[in-house]
């Protein structure tokens, strides 16, 4: 039996315009963890968002208005590939993923956390970003060494 696909929820105008733009997020930028202590899911369980942005403090301000909450910055880490870093973080913490209000910008990137998991997220973010940045440095060093060998032998 044929079922019609469920239409995606319409976002507010600003969020919809942002999603319609073609973006390349496999570039240098920042990955952040924002904590919303007001989004209570149980005893000691709140919500954190793992996301990417080139301007994370502006993003915090925008999301605080969008979700009508005062988000707190738990970590902001510079990385050479912000999309890859964010994807790895989402895979690491996939078991605690929980969507927020459907239709709002970034509503699928939220995770249920307690104080221990917040610390785990912060440490993991620094480790993943360090690994990716190191891989980029090694790649650049190998390219420079190869070029110098070819040009100056």
Placement of each model-derived feature along the sequence:
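Non-catalytic accessory segments flanking enzymatic or RNA/DNA-binding domains
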Residues: 1-153
